[in-house]
Amino acid sequence: MNDLIAAADSVYSFINRTAEKVPEGYRWKTVDYTDHPQYHFNVFNGVGGIPLFLRDYHLLTGNTRALELAEGAVAWCISDNPEVCNHQRGVQLGKTGIASVCLYLDGLSGSGTLHPFCQSNAAHLLSEPVGPITDLLSGEASNGWFFLKLWERTGADLYLQGAIRCARWISEQLIRDELGTYCLVNPDGSWGRVPYAGLSHGTAGVAHFFALLFQATGDATWKAVAHELLETLVRHAIPDHGGLNWSIKLGEKALLRCQHSHGASGIGGVFAKASAALGESDLLKVAAMAGEAAYQYGDFRNNPTLCTGLAGSGELFVELFKFTGNEMWWDRAKEFARLAMGYKASLPEGDCWPTDTAGLYSADYAYGASGTGHFFLRTLRPLEFEMPLL
């Protein structure tokens, strides 16, 4: 396992070397969705997700500089007010994600002190109407997920009711037709009238939120909704590479993706976690079939990242090892981690870790070093470190 430790150390060295000290804290120049450089707070591919790796790297190594960088990154993100995409709501694209990262860091101290930004962002969410986006990436499923995390931390009923408020609104947007039960990303159809299947924008991500809400409340209403959504996904599962995979949108047949955001790697993780949340072992069998497809696809996108690459599929293997105890899945996670190590670039300035575009390097979470590095940490300690955004 020394090679995994060395890989995590390499990711940290890249993040530490590229950190920029500014009056507000620490920031990094990351790469946006169109492959252009940016300074942005978002968790998805901005500065906001970098502390997720740094926090757990600190726990693994005791490196206090990693924690300093993580706290400085949060401080900068809270202060950042970009001219574009300055969303206050949503976990991966909005400031709710920074509040979620604050929660993740707060757990280190054991003091019970809650970062004030968690409360202020929650108050902002509660002050506005619910909607219009449904998904887990940064819609109401993500906001409901944040409320559940905040309720777990504080026990305050206000936050549980916030999660229920999100769930009720999503329930009102559900469509039941020949495709099954689903919701559109935006009920007004601006994202199209054909529903997505996957974790980021689709049925799987919304099902995950409802399963967690049932686990928190014991309310059979939410279990029934989770069931409907998961059963829809089972209906649309397509045999592929010896396992199961999903098209990007329900009802389509083309299998274009098998990754964390779209396809078996992310959807399998939802089924694995739902098996525990709903107490149903059959769901774990679906997760294992998704895992088989993800393994057989291998490095089909030719990158190490969480969103589209090896780390995203490897994370499913870690989850399957945790839930089944079958060491085959841990071995597969280690195999994918070692494939991901091969993408490290040793440049004159030091080690660099790529995005899913060859020749571009970034410290961010979904498309950069932090997500890849966190997968290394989870592969090292699969029973200790959790997926922080799931």
What residues fall within each predicted segment?
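Glycan-recognition and catalytic cores of secretory/periplasmic carbohydrate-active enzymes
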Residues: 1-390
